[in-house]
């Protein structure tokens, strides 16, 4: 059996309205243009962004919702739909650490559960040096209720 590495990452942001969907769709389109099979995913129960993903990728975008589903089910969904893809792009929701009960159901929780590297999208409009501590905080922040993802 051939084992191949696939590119996979999660697109997150410090808040909603930062451009996650625009960046996600742009990366999906670029990778498809380069001949890759891209599997889209979306954190949470969102059904609008998944329609955009599906239109670009011509594959169903799958919701990864750790609030409504068990960690095991989310892992199973990810593994099932990632099969056969060259790249998996997961779009986060809201702010990276925003969820139901602090971080429960957050993009950070999904990234930790699936061991996905995170690409952080920051809207730096009307800012300059102030973006640096924002980025630093996102890198160094530890969830207030860490979970065991084993």
Residue ranges and their predicted role:
Residues 2-18, 22, 28-114, 122-139:
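ATP-dependent carboxylate-amine ligase catalytic core
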Residues 141-150:
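Single conserved hydrophobic/aromatic residue that forms the stacking wall/gate
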């Amino acid at each position: 059996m051939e084992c191949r590495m696939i590119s996979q990452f999660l697109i997150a942001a410090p808040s909603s309205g930062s451009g996650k969907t625009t960046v996600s769709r742009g990366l999906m389109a670029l990778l498809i243009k380069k001949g890759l099979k891209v599997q889209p995913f979306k954190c949470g129960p969102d059904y609008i962004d998944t329609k955009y993903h599906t239109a670009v990728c011509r594959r169903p975008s799958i919701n990864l919702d750790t609030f409504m589903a068990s960690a095991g089910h989310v892992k199973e969904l990810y593994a099932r739909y990632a099969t056969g893809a060259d790249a998996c792009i997961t779009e986060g929701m809201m702010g990276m650490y925003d969820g139901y009960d602090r971080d429960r159901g957050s993009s950070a929780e999904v990234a930790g559960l699936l061991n996905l590297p995170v690409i952080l999208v920051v809207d730096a409009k009307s800012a300059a040096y102030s973006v640096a501590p924002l980025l630093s905080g996102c890198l160094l922040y530890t969830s207030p209720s860490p979970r065991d993802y084993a």
